[in-house]
Design a protein with these regions (language model features):
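Catalytic center-proximal scaffold of phosphoryl-transfer enzymes
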Residues: 1-282
Length: 282
Protein backbone atom coordinates (compact mmCIF):
# COMPACT_ATOMS: atom_id res chain seq x y z
CA UNK A 1 0.00 0.00 0.00
CA UNK A 2 2.90 2.34 0.67
CA UNK A 3 4.17 1.81 -2.86
CA UNK A 4 0.72 2.78 -4.19
CA UNK A 5 0.56 5.82 -1.90
CA UNK A 6 3.89 7.24 -3.06
CA UNK A 7 2.71 7.11 -6.68
CA UNK A 8 -0.25 9.41 -6.00
CA UNK A 9 -0.25 13.12 -6.93
CA UNK A 10 -1.34 14.26 -3.45
CA UNK A 11 -0.58 12.93 0.03
CA UNK A 12 -1.95 14.29 3.31
CA UNK A 13 0.30 14.01 6.39
CA UNK A 14 -0.03 14.62 10.12
CA UNK A 15 1.29 13.22 13.40
CA UNK A 16 0.06 12.62 16.92
CA UNK A 17 1.55 11.76 20.29
CA UNK A 18 2.22 8.17 21.38
CA UNK A 19 3.55 6.93 24.71
CA UNK A 20 5.79 3.86 24.51
CA UNK A 21 6.99 2.62 27.89
CA UNK A 22 10.07 0.55 27.09
CA UNK A 23 12.02 2.36 24.39
CA UNK A 24 15.81 1.85 24.67
CA UNK A 25 17.52 4.80 26.33
CA UNK A 26 14.28 6.68 26.95
CA UNK A 27 11.92 7.12 29.87
CA UNK A 28 8.21 6.20 29.60
CA UNK A 29 7.39 9.90 29.92
CA UNK A 30 9.20 10.87 26.71
CA UNK A 31 6.83 11.35 23.80
CA UNK A 32 7.00 9.32 20.61
CA UNK A 33 4.85 9.84 17.54
CA UNK A 34 2.44 8.13 15.21
CA UNK A 35 2.82 9.70 11.79
CA UNK A 36 -0.25 9.41 9.56
CA UNK A 37 -0.38 9.54 5.76
CA UNK A 38 -3.48 9.51 3.58
CA UNK A 39 -4.46 9.60 -0.05
CA UNK A 40 -6.60 12.56 -1.07
CA UNK A 41 -10.38 12.59 -1.11
CA UNK A 42 -10.23 12.47 -4.93
CA UNK A 43 -7.99 9.43 -5.13
CA UNK A 44 -9.51 6.34 -6.73
CA UNK A 45 -7.88 4.14 -4.10
CA UNK A 46 -8.19 5.30 -0.50
CA UNK A 47 -5.06 4.61 1.54
CA UNK A 48 -4.36 5.27 5.22
CA UNK A 49 -0.88 4.45 6.53
CA UNK A 50 0.54 4.94 10.01
CA UNK A 51 4.18 4.93 11.05
CA UNK A 52 5.64 4.68 14.56
CA UNK A 53 8.63 6.91 15.26
CA UNK A 54 10.45 7.98 18.42
CA UNK A 55 10.74 11.52 17.10
CA UNK A 56 8.77 14.40 15.60
CA UNK A 57 11.71 15.42 13.43
CA UNK A 58 10.95 16.16 9.80
CA UNK A 59 13.48 13.48 8.86
CA UNK A 60 10.84 10.89 9.81
CA UNK A 61 8.52 12.15 7.08
CA UNK A 62 11.44 12.58 4.68
CA UNK A 63 12.41 8.93 5.06
CA UNK A 64 8.85 7.65 4.77
CA UNK A 65 8.13 9.76 1.67
CA UNK A 66 11.35 8.92 -0.15
CA UNK A 67 10.58 8.84 -3.87
CA UNK A 68 7.40 10.92 -3.60
CA UNK A 69 7.35 13.85 -6.04
CA UNK A 70 3.83 15.22 -5.68
CA UNK A 71 1.99 17.66 -3.42
CA UNK A 72 2.19 17.16 0.34
CA UNK A 73 -0.68 18.71 2.31
CA UNK A 74 -0.01 19.33 6.00
CA UNK A 75 -0.57 21.64 8.92
CA UNK A 76 1.94 24.40 9.67
CA UNK A 77 4.58 22.24 11.38
CA UNK A 78 7.99 23.50 10.24
CA UNK A 79 9.48 19.99 10.15
CA UNK A 80 7.89 19.35 6.76
CA UNK A 81 10.14 22.07 5.33
CA UNK A 82 13.10 19.68 5.19
CA UNK A 83 11.41 17.43 2.62
CA UNK A 84 12.80 18.13 -0.84
CA UNK A 85 11.33 17.87 -4.34
CA UNK A 86 7.71 18.28 -3.31
CA UNK A 87 5.09 21.02 -3.48
CA UNK A 88 3.63 21.87 -0.08
CA UNK A 89 -0.02 22.74 0.51
CA UNK A 90 -1.37 24.26 3.71
CA UNK A 91 -4.56 23.84 5.68
CA UNK A 92 -7.28 26.49 5.94
CA UNK A 93 -8.98 24.50 8.71
CA UNK A 94 -5.90 25.02 10.87
CA UNK A 95 -5.89 28.69 9.91
CA UNK A 96 -9.51 29.05 10.93
CA UNK A 97 -8.80 27.25 14.22
CA UNK A 98 -6.10 29.81 15.05
CA UNK A 99 -8.65 32.62 14.78
CA UNK A 100 -11.16 30.66 16.85
CA UNK A 101 -8.58 30.16 19.61
CA UNK A 102 -7.88 33.92 19.60
CA UNK A 103 -11.55 34.89 19.82
CA UNK A 104 -12.73 36.30 23.16
CA UNK A 105 -16.12 35.30 24.52
CA UNK A 106 -18.93 37.23 22.86
CA UNK A 107 -16.72 38.34 19.96
CA UNK A 108 -18.31 39.72 16.80
CA UNK A 109 -16.90 40.79 13.45
CA UNK A 110 -17.48 44.38 14.51
CA UNK A 111 -15.48 44.23 17.75
CA UNK A 112 -12.95 41.42 17.26
CA UNK A 113 -10.14 40.99 14.73
CA UNK A 114 -10.10 37.27 15.50
CA UNK A 115 -13.79 37.03 14.62
CA UNK A 116 -13.10 38.90 11.39
CA UNK A 117 -10.29 36.48 10.48
CA UNK A 118 -12.58 33.55 11.29
CA UNK A 119 -15.24 35.02 9.01
CA UNK A 120 -12.76 35.30 6.12
CA UNK A 121 -11.97 31.59 6.46
CA UNK A 122 -15.68 30.78 6.54
CA UNK A 123 -16.19 32.66 3.28
CA UNK A 124 -13.45 30.62 1.65
CA UNK A 125 -15.01 27.33 2.77
CA UNK A 126 -18.49 28.48 1.68
CA UNK A 127 -17.25 28.92 -1.89
CA UNK A 128 -15.09 25.80 -1.75
CA UNK A 129 -18.11 23.61 -0.93
CA UNK A 130 -19.83 24.78 -4.11
CA UNK A 131 -16.82 23.74 -6.21
CA UNK A 132 -16.39 20.29 -4.67
CA UNK A 133 -17.77 18.26 -7.58
CA UNK A 134 -15.91 20.06 -10.37
CA UNK A 135 -13.08 18.35 -12.29
CA UNK A 136 -9.59 19.30 -11.10
CA UNK A 137 -8.74 21.77 -13.86
CA UNK A 138 -12.09 23.53 -13.70
CA UNK A 139 -11.96 23.70 -9.92
CA UNK A 140 -8.57 25.43 -10.07
CA UNK A 141 -9.92 28.02 -12.53
CA UNK A 142 -12.99 28.68 -10.40
CA UNK A 143 -10.90 28.98 -7.25
CA UNK A 144 -8.77 31.66 -8.88
CA UNK A 145 -11.90 33.45 -10.02
CA UNK A 146 -13.94 33.19 -6.81
CA UNK A 147 -11.62 32.43 -3.88
CA UNK A 148 -8.41 34.27 -4.78
CA UNK A 149 -10.07 37.71 -4.41
CA UNK A 150 -11.17 36.72 -0.88
CA UNK A 151 -7.63 35.62 -0.01
CA UNK A 152 -6.17 38.82 -1.48
CA UNK A 153 -8.59 40.83 0.65
CA UNK A 154 -7.73 38.67 3.66
CA UNK A 155 -4.00 39.32 3.43
CA UNK A 156 -4.51 43.02 2.75
CA UNK A 157 -6.60 43.14 5.94
CA UNK A 158 -3.93 41.25 7.93
CA UNK A 159 -1.41 43.97 7.05
CA UNK A 160 -3.62 46.49 8.87
CA UNK A 161 -3.40 44.61 12.19
CA UNK A 162 -0.98 46.64 14.30
CA UNK A 163 1.19 44.93 16.92
CA UNK A 164 -1.04 41.95 17.75
CA UNK A 165 -0.36 40.06 20.97
CA UNK A 166 -1.19 36.73 22.57
CA UNK A 167 -3.26 34.29 20.54
CA UNK A 168 -4.11 36.99 18.00
CA UNK A 169 -0.40 37.30 17.28
CA UNK A 170 -0.23 33.51 16.86
CA UNK A 171 -3.01 33.62 14.26
CA UNK A 172 -1.44 36.52 12.34
CA UNK A 173 1.98 34.85 12.41
CA UNK A 174 0.49 31.59 11.14
CA UNK A 175 -1.26 33.41 8.30
CA UNK A 176 1.90 35.24 7.23
CA UNK A 177 4.26 32.28 7.54
CA UNK A 178 1.89 29.87 5.79
CA UNK A 179 0.77 32.19 2.98
CA UNK A 180 2.63 30.36 0.19
CA UNK A 181 1.26 26.98 1.27
CA UNK A 182 -2.26 28.25 1.97
CA UNK A 183 -2.42 29.50 -1.62
CA UNK A 184 -1.26 26.24 -3.26
CA UNK A 185 -4.80 24.90 -3.59
CA UNK A 186 -5.78 27.87 -5.79
CA UNK A 187 -3.65 26.51 -8.63
CA UNK A 188 -4.03 22.77 -8.06
CA UNK A 189 -7.59 21.52 -8.36
CA UNK A 190 -6.58 18.09 -7.08
CA UNK A 191 -5.69 19.63 -3.69
CA UNK A 192 -8.23 20.28 -0.93
CA UNK A 193 -8.56 23.50 1.05
CA UNK A 194 -7.82 21.66 4.29
CA UNK A 195 -5.88 18.74 5.72
CA UNK A 196 -9.01 17.26 7.30
CA UNK A 197 -8.65 14.07 5.25
CA UNK A 198 -5.75 12.80 7.33
CA UNK A 199 -7.04 14.26 10.59
CA UNK A 200 -10.21 12.23 10.11
CA UNK A 201 -8.09 9.17 9.33
CA UNK A 202 -6.36 9.58 12.69
CA UNK A 203 -9.60 9.65 14.64
CA UNK A 204 -9.50 5.91 15.31
CA UNK A 205 -6.01 6.24 16.77
CA UNK A 206 -6.90 9.27 18.89
CA UNK A 207 -10.11 7.73 20.25
CA UNK A 208 -8.42 4.36 20.77
CA UNK A 209 -5.56 5.97 22.67
CA UNK A 210 -8.01 7.18 25.32
CA UNK A 211 -8.74 3.51 26.03
CA UNK A 212 -5.42 1.72 25.58
CA UNK A 213 -3.36 4.74 26.79
CA UNK A 214 0.08 3.53 25.67
CA UNK A 215 2.11 0.85 23.92
CA UNK A 216 4.37 -1.10 26.25
CA UNK A 217 7.18 -1.85 23.79
CA UNK A 218 8.43 -0.62 20.39
CA UNK A 219 7.36 -3.96 18.89
CA UNK A 220 3.87 -3.37 20.24
CA UNK A 221 3.86 0.12 18.74
CA UNK A 222 4.94 -1.28 15.36
CA UNK A 223 2.19 -3.90 15.51
CA UNK A 224 -0.37 -1.24 16.41
CA UNK A 225 0.40 1.02 13.46
CA UNK A 226 0.31 -1.94 11.07
CA UNK A 227 -3.09 -2.93 12.42
CA UNK A 228 -4.41 0.63 12.16
CA UNK A 229 -3.08 0.93 8.59
CA UNK A 230 -4.92 -2.21 7.50
CA UNK A 231 -8.15 -1.42 9.36
CA UNK A 232 -8.41 2.26 8.46
CA UNK A 233 -7.62 1.59 4.79
CA UNK A 234 -10.27 -1.14 4.72
CA UNK A 235 -12.84 1.21 6.26
CA UNK A 236 -11.90 4.03 3.87
CA UNK A 237 -12.65 1.73 0.93
CA UNK A 238 -16.06 0.75 2.28
CA UNK A 239 -15.08 -2.70 3.54
CA UNK A 240 -16.24 -4.55 6.61
CA UNK A 241 -12.95 -4.61 8.59
CA UNK A 242 -13.73 -7.89 10.34
CA UNK A 243 -14.54 -9.69 7.08
CA UNK A 244 -11.44 -8.25 5.45
CA UNK A 245 -9.15 -9.37 8.27
CA UNK A 246 -10.68 -12.84 8.30
CA UNK A 247 -10.14 -13.16 4.55
CA UNK A 248 -6.51 -12.03 4.46
CA UNK A 249 -5.60 -14.05 7.57
CA UNK A 250 -7.11 -17.12 5.91
CA UNK A 251 -5.33 -16.62 2.59
CA UNK A 252 -1.93 -15.19 3.53
CA UNK A 253 -0.38 -17.95 5.69
CA UNK A 254 -0.69 -20.60 2.99
CA UNK A 255 0.41 -18.20 0.25
CA UNK A 256 3.53 -17.06 2.10
CA UNK A 257 4.35 -20.62 3.15
CA UNK A 258 4.65 -21.49 -0.53
CA UNK A 259 6.41 -18.26 -1.51
CA UNK A 260 7.57 -15.62 1.02
CA UNK A 261 7.67 -13.06 -1.82
CA UNK A 262 4.23 -13.89 -3.18
CA UNK A 263 2.25 -11.12 -4.84
CA UNK A 264 -0.62 -9.76 -2.72
CA UNK A 265 -2.13 -7.25 -5.13
CA UNK A 266 -5.34 -9.28 -5.27
CA UNK A 267 -5.71 -8.76 -1.49
CA UNK A 268 -5.53 -4.97 -1.51
CA UNK A 269 -8.72 -3.32 -0.18
CA UNK A 270 -9.74 -1.86 -3.54
CA UNK A 271 -9.39 -5.11 -5.49
CA UNK A 272 -12.70 -5.96 -7.21
CA UNK A 273 -12.88 -9.44 -5.67
CA UNK A 274 -12.13 -8.07 -2.20
CA UNK A 275 -14.81 -5.41 -2.65
CA UNK A 276 -17.28 -8.13 -3.59
CA UNK A 277 -16.37 -10.39 -0.65
CA UNK A 278 -15.89 -7.84 2.13
CA UNK A 279 -17.98 -4.80 1.30
CA UNK A 280 -20.01 -3.36 4.17
CA UNK A 281 -23.57 -4.65 4.17
CA UNK A 282 -22.73 -7.79 2.19
Amino acid sequence: MKKCLLMLPVIHADETVLQVNKEPGRTPQQESRIWAYSSSKRSKHQIRLFQYEMSRKGACATNFLEGFRGILQTDGYSGYGVIGEIIRAGCWAHMRRKWLEAMPKGATVENSKAAKGYEFCGRIFDVERKLEDLPDAERAVKRQELIKPIIDEYYAWIETIFKPSGKLKDAVTYAVNQKEFLCTFLYHGEVEASNNQVENAQRGVVVGRKNWLFCDTPKGAEASVIAYSILETAKANGLNPEKYLMHIFTVLPDRFAKNPNADIEDLLPWNDKIMELCKLGV
